[in-house]
Amino acid sequence: MDKNSRYTVDSSILFRQWLNDTREMVQDTIFHSRIQKKNNNHPVSQRVFFEQNAHSHYFSYRNNKNLFKENPVSYIRHQSLYNVLKNLKKGRYNPDISIDLHGLTQHQAQQALGELITTCQKEKIFCAHIMHGHGKHILKKQTPFWLSQHPDIIAFHEAPKFFGSDAAIIVIIEINSLKKNINIFN
């Protein structure tokens, strides 16, 4: 028995003794409770709420299972905007804003996406990063479907490895001032 094997045997025994009284953790599913709505009559907050709600109105719950089966997930609103998708796939657009949907319910995720689109249009940000994660694949399957229904989404594609790979999406959002001049992306 050489020095190295003796050292590993001793450290292995010590490690087992140290973990002797531990028990295995049980991973449970977390159930979220409904959030109680506040009665807020402030006109500015109501306006912001209605804008965000208007954007989340486009997201329906119907599920078309055949729509986004290809991997990686990608979408363009119109074939004339194919150059935008091509540049997005090549990684030429860097997102200026990011949102993480981990741990949210479907309704909360829709509200968060509506808030993201509202913020992007107000701040004139055209590229966003949406992190939906893996989990039980509910948000992973629904997020591309919801985004494809929104009229202000120009294109989206699975994020590069640096931004989360298949657990995230990079989105190009149409800004109101860009509706007149869409050639900014060429």
From Swiss-Prot:
GO biological process terms held by the UniProt record: rescue of stalled ribosome
Native source species: Buchnera aphidicola subsp. Acyrthosiphon pisum (strain APS)
GO molecular function, one term: rRNA binding
Primary role: Acts as a ribosome collision sensor. Detects stalled/collided disomes (pairs of ribosomes where the leading ribosome is stalled and a second ribosome has collided with it) and endonucleolytically cleaves mRNA at the 5' boundary of the stalled ribosome. Stalled/collided disomes form a new interface (primarily via the 30S subunits) that binds SmrB. Cleaved mRNA becomes available for tmRNA ligation, leading to ribosomal subunit dissociation and rescue of stalled ribosomes.
Annotated TM spans: none
Enzyme class: hydrolase
Known EC number: 3.1.-.-
Keyword Transferase: no
Designated name of the protein: Ribosome rescue factor SmrB
InterPro entries to which the protein is assigned, alphabetical: Smr_dom, Smr_dom_sf, SmrB-like
Gene from which the chain derives: smrB
Family (UniProt): Belongs to the SmrB family.
Matching SMART domains: SMR
Tree of life domain: Bacteria
